Swiss-Prot record:
Organism: Salmonella paratyphi B (strain ATCC BAA-1250 / SPB7)
Single GO MF annotation: nucleotide binding
Binding of Zn(2+), residues: E184, H247, H264
Organism phylogeny: Bacteria, Pseudomonadati, Pseudomonadota, Gammaproteobacteria, Enterobacterales
Cofactor: Co(2+); Zn(2+); NAD(+)
Pfam families for the chain: DHQ_synthase, DHQS_C
Protein name: 3-dehydroquinate synthase
EC number: 4.2.3.4
Database matches in CDD domains: DHQS (cd08195)
HAMAP family noted in UniProt: DHQ_synthase
Length: 362
């Protein structure tokens, strides 16, 4: 069992990583006998894990209610959020309740925002079931729902009480979802850790076949990097923005194509290559390193070009609504070398459009 602490003073919390955690009531600390829980999951995961998690919590004396939501990025919305609020109010659940997010990034983000909002804030626990959510979205307290005009535009910074990463969940993960998560894994190597990127080049095949030790190390290293960044910059005033490599371009793809048509990691993968191309055009990133990135993404089964349905001009309206925009100026996360990156303002639209055009499908 691995345990990593996100250090935020009195709001610090553990990330527990191991196989078989759903069999151990102690995995779900700080829950205790007599606590009330609303377990939030989706229609795909409920048949797989709902009864198992409910059972382990009830054996610990926890009172468990549940709400099952539709599955998909398109349901990460205010309308579906209201379904959670209605379930909480009907029981009813008070300020001493705990929300448990059992699912991937959509469930985690939506449940976290529900916890931040319900009765001005209640406790919640992240139980991520996809690789993407285990290495990224469950850690750090970013919670949100989407708006038709932009991804994650309505939300809050709100930290969980704990994160429970059961590696066994990856056994039921579709191959496309596994690849989507690998985009975020590869991102960490590009922005923060050249040695980890090199490790990924040598161990990607092991990750694709869900090799236990390789996957445990991969998830642990990603969580360590994320925990360090969040501890240093919880509210994304500087360093934490680096975690958005590829996301400004990627969010534009998701919004323009319709949420769910491109998985988040797929859009981020294409966005990472666009960011690398932009950095190349600015003379601060080598084409050889871009090719290393492209090769690793392609081995993971990820796209390295944007959708053929989008022109370069289609990206800009979405990108200018990005949360990193200041005073109307586009700011991009750009790689400087494998393992090193920066947030750069003042990148011309010409450079951005050219970088996108470099990544257009033929």
């Amino acid at each position: 069992m691995e345990r990593i602490t996100v250090t935020l003073g009195e709001r610090s919390y553990p990330i527990t990583i191991a196989a078989g955690l759903f069999n151990e009531p102690a995995s779900f600390l700080p829950l205790k006998s007599g606590d009330q829980v609303m377990l939030v999951t989706n229609e795909t995961l409920a048949p797989l894990y709902l009864d198992k998690v409910r059972g382990v919590l009830e054996r610990a004396g926890v009172n468990v209610d549940s709400v099952i939501l539709p599955d998909g990025e398109q349901y990460k919305s205010l309308t579906v959020l209201d379904t959670v609020f209605t379930a909480l109010l009907k029981k009813p659940h008070g300020r001493d309740t705990t929300l448990v997010a059992l699912g991937g990034g959509v469930i985690g983000d939506l449940t976290g925002f529900a916890a931040a909002s319900y009765q001005r804030g209640v406790r919640f626990i992240q139980v991520p079931t996809t690789l993407l959510s285990q290495v990224d979205s469950s850690v750090g307290g970013k919670t949100a729902v989407n708006h038709p005009l932009g991804k994650n535009m309505i939300g809050a910074f709100y930290q969980p009480a704990s994160v429970v990463v059961d590696l066994d969940c990856l056994k039921t993960l579709p191959a496309r979802e596994l690849a989507s998560g690998l985009a975020e894994v590869i991102k960490y190597g590009i922005i923060l850790d050249a040695d980890f990127f090199t490790w990924l080049e040598g161990n990607l095949d092991a990750l694709l076949r869900l090799d236990g030790p390789a996957m445990a190390y991969c998830i642990r290293r990603c969580c360590e990097l994320k925990a360090e960044v969040v501890a240093a910059d919880e509210r994304e005033a500087g360093l934490r923005a680096l975690l958005n490599l590829g996301h400004t371009f990627g969010h534009a793809i998701e919004a323009e194509m319709g949420y769910g048509n491109w998985l988040h990691g797929e859009a981020v993968a294409a966005g990472i290559v666009m960011a690398a191309r932009a950095s190349e055009r600015l003379g601060q990133f080598s084409s050889a390193d871009t090719q290393r990135i492209i090769a690793l993404l392609e081995r993971a089964g990820l796209p390295v070009n944007g959708p053929c349905e989008m022109s370069a001009q289609d990206y800009l309206p979405h990108m200018l609504r990005d949360k990193k925009v200041l005073a109307g100026e586009l700011r991009l996360v750009l790689p400087l070398a494998i393992g090193k990156s920066e947030v750069r303002g003042g990148v011309s639209h010409e450079v951005v459009l050219s970088a996108i055009a470099d990544c257009q499908q033929a």
